Amino acid sequence: MENTVTPNVGETAYNRFRQFSTLSYNCIKLLMDENELIWKLLKYSDSDAWSKPNLTQAEKGALIYSGQQDTSQYHVFMDGMQPDVQVKEITLLRIMPTFAVGMNRTLGYIEVGMEVFSHYKINHLSNYKTRIDTITEELLATFNGKDVGGLGLLSFDKMADQSSRLFEAGQIPFGGKKIIFSTYSA
C-alpha cells in the first residue's frame, strides 16, 4: 500500500517574514549611498563635522561593526547591544528590526528602530544645531517613504503602524533619540 501525503491547503500562503534579518543591512547600505551628512557626523567629533569633506565608501564601511572583538571602535551597529564600555566622546547609530506582528496569515508588519546616541560634550555643532537632532532629522528625511532594497516601504506614520514614533533615549554621558519606522511584510 502506498502512503499518500495530503498537502495542507493554503500552507504556502503564510507570511514567512523573510526580510526580517536583512532590514538592518539594507538600511545601512541605503544610508551609505544616499546621505553624506550622517556619516560626517558619525566619524568626526569636531563641532564643524558637518562641513568636513564627504567620506569614501571605504571610510563609511570602516565605521560599521561586523563582528570584531572590540565593539567600542565602531559607530554603526545592526543591533541594540554593546558589551564593551564606551570611553570615547563619539556618536553611535543603531539600526535594527525591533518588533514584528502578524496581522493575519499573509500580512504583517515589522518595526525598524533607529537609535542615535552622542556624547554630550560633542553634541553641539558650530552651525547652532545639535548632532543628535541633525542625525534624527536626516534619518527621517532619508527613510520615510523609502523602499529599502526591495524589502518594503519604511514609513513613519500612524496609518501603517500605531507604534511609529520618536522619543528621547540614552543615559548620561550619552544622549539620544530613537525613531520607530514600520514596513509591511507579506
PLM feature segments, named:
Residues 1-104:
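Small/polar-rich, solvent-exposed N-terminal microdomains that initiate assembly or binding
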Residues 96-98, 113-117, 180-184:
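Residue-level recognition of well-ordered beta-strand positions that form the cores
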Residues 88-92, 107-111, 169-178:
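A general secondary-structure signal for short beta-strands and their flanking turns/coil
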Residues 83-92, 120-144, 152-154:
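Acidic, Ser/Thr- and Gly-enriched intrinsically disordered low-complexity segments
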Residues 100-102, 119-123, 186:
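Generic "edge-of-domain/loop-turn" microfeature
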Residues 103-106, 128:
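Short histidine-centered beta-strand/loop micro-motifs
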Residues 107-124:
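Short acidic, glycine/tyrosine-flanked loop/strand segments centered on an H-E-D-like triad
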Residues 132-186:
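Acidic-leaning, charged glycine-interspersed low-complexity segments
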